[in-house]
Regions:
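C-terminal "cap" of GNAT-fold acetyltransferases
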Residues: 138, 159-191
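Conserved GNAT-family N-acetyltransferase fold
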Residues: 74, 84-86, 101, 106, ...
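Active-site rim helix/loop that mediates acceptor-substrate recognition in acyltransferases
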Residues: 40, 47-92
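Conserved acetyl-CoA-binding loop-helix of GNAT-fold acetyltransferases
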Residues: 103, 108, 114-127, 139
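A conserved beta-turn-beta hairpin within the catalytic core of GNAT-like acetyltransferases
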Residues: 91-103, 113
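A short beta-loop-alpha structural element at the N-terminal edge
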Residues: 26-39
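Conserved active-site alpha-helix within GNAT-family acetyltransferase domains
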Residues: 131-135, 140-164
Length: 191
């Protein structure tokens, strides 16, 4: 099920670290079929020069969509152009906990990075999960960045093969799940 943004953020959300150009309007909304090619292209561009990337993130989003596993898929649109995207999909946890999701990939076109668009997408995705009564969310990413959204490494939640400090969780409804987390097979997509 997709989350539909009920309002435009104009000119920028209050949590944006840098103001957007005053003549621009940022709009967050659920993806539509017409957005698929733009999401693929912007995801590829966003991760093209990232040293930490497998450079398959665009294929992961495509595979999640093909499997019907995009629980939340939001785009950031500026003056009619899709410039950002966030994907959220279900994860499984070895303790049997339900209602947990993985956030990512999250992408912003390089020319628009550092202007609060990623933060706006993060807040909107987490709000969509709250509206779905999700129990929690996990992600793989930079602790210094994602910590400001409430994410932190939890010793009881493990993603095999990943340094513990980069695998982070946000519990939305206690209790916190415990165990090994498994993402969708879509995360193995390479084309």
């Amino acid at each position: 099920m997709f989350f539909e943004a009920r309002r435009s953020l104009h000119p920028a959300p209050p949590w944006a670290p840098l103001p957007l150009k005053s003549s621009m309007t940022l709009r967050l909304r659920a993806e539509s079929p017409a957005d698929h090619a733009a999401i693929h292209a912007l995801t590829e561009a966003a991760f093209r020069d990232a040293a930490h990337s497998s450079h398959t993130e665009q294929f992961i989003v495509d595979a999640l969509r093909a499997r019907g596993e995009l629980s939340v898929s939001l785009v950031a649109e500026m003056d009619g152009k899709v410039i950002g995207h966030v994907a959220v999909s279900p994860v499984t946890i070895s303790d049997g906990s339900t209602g947990w999701f993985g956030l990512g990939p999250i992408s912003v076109l390089p020319a628009w990075q550092g202007q609060g668009i990623g933060a706006a997408l993060m807040h909107a995705a987490l709000e969509a999960l709250r509206q779905q009564a999700a129990h929690g969310c996990v992600l793989l990413g930079e602790p210094a960045y994602y910590g400001r959204f409430g994410f932190r490494a939890e010793p009881g939640l493990v993603l095999r093969g990943v340094p513990a400090e980069y695998f982070q969780a946000l519990c939305l409804q206690p209790p916190l799940a415990q165990g090994e987390v498994q993402y969708s097979p879509a995360f193995e997509a390479t084309a």
